[in-house]
Amino acid sequence: ISVSGHKFFGIDSPCGLFITTRDVYDNQSTYDISYLNANMRMINCSRSGIEPLKFWWLMKTVGDEGWTEQAARIFENTRYLKSELKRIGWPYWNNEYSNTVIFRRPSAKVVRKYNLACGEDAAFGGKLSHVVVMQHVTKDSIDRLIADLRDETISDL
């Protein structure tokens, strides 16, 4: 099980939580870390001591009930974004257990307006953007994005 502290919990820098079984951990490949002069099992590339403290502080501050409510809202909004993209015929991809929705990249104007992250992947149809549906993403903000995407679809006709 893995969870992004950055993309789900909103921590201001990349970090994550990874839970595994002892068998998987014990059978993981080791990597030679030249600057440590040692072989190590590496699940993540960071050894920051601050990020786990931020993660712990957030977990304790918000609490189980708070995170349960936030997770429900995040996934509700993720499903809403997907249903709206489907409704306007805009291609998208998403793992049902993820709050990241990847979709065909819109115009540069829309990318700038919403500060969309962009990339390319031939397997998914070329130029892409994605939205990470977090606590600050609302149905109103999704509706505004969808309206702009719909306008692009109409202007393409």
Tell where the protein language model's regions lie, with residue ranges:
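Active-site C-terminal subdomain of aminotransferase-like
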Residues: 1-95
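Generic non-transmembrane alpha-helical segments
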Residues: 80, 84-88, 109-115, 148-156
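PLP-dependent enzyme catalytic core of the Aspartate aminotransferase-like
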Residues: 123-157
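Residues in well-ordered beta-strands of folded domains
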Residues: 2, 19, 56, 102-104, ...
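Generic structural signal for hydrophobic core residues of well-folded globular domains
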Residues: 58-62, 105, 149-153
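Conserved PLP cofactor-binding pocket of PLP-dependent enzymes
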Residues: 95, 99-100, 116-133
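C-terminal, non-catalytic "cap/extension" segments appended to globular domains
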Residues: 71, 79, 111, 124-125
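Conserved PLP-binding catalytic core of the aspartate aminotransferase-like
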Residues: 89-115
